[in-house]
């Protein structure tokens, strides 16, 4: 059974090819000798016309190249022009316009975000500088052990100077009072020294 089916499969293509050949033979056999001659003449004419058209096309292409060379249009310029034209056509499409608008909007958002970050950083540095200056001038610093030690030494030194100069206030005082007293005592000492110098000059 399988051998018979295979035989049928093998014979069918052959029968089809034979049918085509028979059809061609039948079609050509239907033409008369006069019609065959007319078709052959028409075939020759068509081939001649195609050859002539190819020659004309080749001549036109050569003439086109000559004109472009005279106008200074080379292949690179043509490519640039084609690219520019294609780019312009692409920019006018709706998809490109939507994409361009989306990217522009995103760029504006990014720029605004960077500006906000820069402003925040500048403000933070300004607050830090103010905090440092404020902390230096705060009373808490004057209450530190280092500043108190320095203040006590200054008061002690000034008190000893006042004792030598002849001041009456030996009770210390605040740091500002000590500084004022020292300045006053120094001016008195300078005045006494100048009077003593004048007296010596008069005695001479």
Swiss-Prot record:
Residues 1-31, 164-204 are annotated as: Disordered. The keyword Phosphoprotein applies. The modification Phosphoserine is found at residues 29, 86, 122, 131, 149, 174. The modification Phosphothreonine is found at residue 146. Residues 179-195 have a biased composition (Polar residues). It comes from the Eukaryota. The modification Omega-N-methylarginine is found at residue 133. Residues 22-73 form a coiled coil. GO terms for molecular function: protein homodimerization activity. One of its GO terms (cellular component) is perinuclear region of cytoplasm. InterPro entries: TPD52. GO terms for biological process: G2/M transition of mitotic cell cycle. Keywords: Coiled coil, Methylation, Phosphoprotein. Belongs to the TPD52 family. Forms a homodimer or heterodimer with other members of the family. This is Tumor protein D53. It comes from Mus musculus (Mouse). The gene is Tpd52l1.
């Amino acid at each position: 059974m399988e051998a018979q089916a295979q035989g049928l499969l093998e014979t069918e293509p052959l029968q089809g090819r034979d049918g085509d050949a028979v059809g061609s033979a039948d079609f050509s056999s239907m033409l008369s000798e006069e019609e065959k001659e007319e078709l052959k003449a028409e075939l020759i004419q068509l081939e001649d016309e195609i050859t002539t058209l190819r020659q004309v096309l080749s001549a036109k292409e050569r003439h086109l190249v000559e004109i472009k060379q005279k106008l200074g249009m080379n292949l690179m310029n043509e490519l640039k022009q084609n690219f520019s034209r294609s780019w312009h056509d692409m920019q006018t499409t709706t998809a490109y316009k939507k994409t361009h608008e989306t990217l522009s909007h995103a760029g504006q958002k990014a720029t605004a975000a960077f500006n906000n970050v820069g402003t925040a950083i500048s403000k933070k540095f300004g607050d830090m500088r103010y905090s440092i200056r404020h902390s230096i001038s705060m009373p808490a610093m004057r209450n530190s052990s280092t500043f108190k030690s320095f203040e006590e030494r200054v008061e002690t030194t000034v008190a000893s100077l006042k004792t030598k100069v002849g001041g009456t206030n030996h009770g210390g005082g605040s740091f500002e009072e000590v500084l004022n007293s020292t300045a006053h005592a120094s001016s008195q000492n300078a005045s006494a020294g100048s009077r003593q110098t004048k007296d010596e000059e008069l005695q001479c």
